[in-house]
Structures are given as C-alpha cells and as structure tokens.
Amino acid sequence: MVSNVRNDVTGNWRIATIAENIEMQDYALDYYKGYFKSDDEIHAIVNFNYKTTTKISVMGNLLDVSVYEYVDKEEHDAKLLFSGKLLKEYHVNKDTGEIEEIQ
C-alpha cells in the first residue's frame, strides 16, 4: 500500500513498506507503472528485510533509483527519509527497462 508521507511539504512524496527479498532496481519500472500518478512524485520504499530505503524519482525517460541504509523510524517523517548512507544508485530506462549502475 502506498500512502502520503507525514510532514512532506511538497505534497509529492509517497511511501510504501515491504518485507520482501526484492532488488528494487529490478522492480522499479513495474512499481513506477503501477503506483506513480505523476512524474513529479518521489516514492520511498522501505524494505524491512534488507533494512534499506529506496528512493524512486523520474528524470526524463529515466528512473533514478537510489538505495539508502534504513534509519530507524524514517518511514514516519519526511524529514528523516533518505537520511541513511547511500549504498547504490541506478538509472532505469522507462522505455527499454535497461538498468545502469551509477554508483
């Protein structure tokens, strides 16, 4: 279930929590097609299995998929979201599904 983020001042942040063995860079395009209502949105997916928070945002024809270390209780406050250490970043082509590791 995707919901709004508490204390988000932009109105564009959404959050979902999961406990799955999913690599978000592989799932990002399907997630985008299913849950994004606007390319202005920024989505956070907290995965309690991996203790990560993934940020998905749109950059033209690419999805920017950034995976961060999970910070305790960050799912409850926009000010804490994405405050963990950046672990990996990927670009996913929205047209082809091609995944490029950025860092």
Region locations from a protein language model:
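Intrinsic-disorder/low-complexity loop/linker signature
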Residues: G11, G60-N61, G97
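Contiguous hydrophobic segments
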Residues: N21, E74-H76, E100
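Exposed beta-strand-loop-beta-strand "reactive/processing" segments of non-cytosolic proteins
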Residues: A44-V92
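Short, low-complexity, Pro/Ser/Thr/Gly-rich segments in the mature regions of secreted, periplasmic
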Residues: H91-Q103
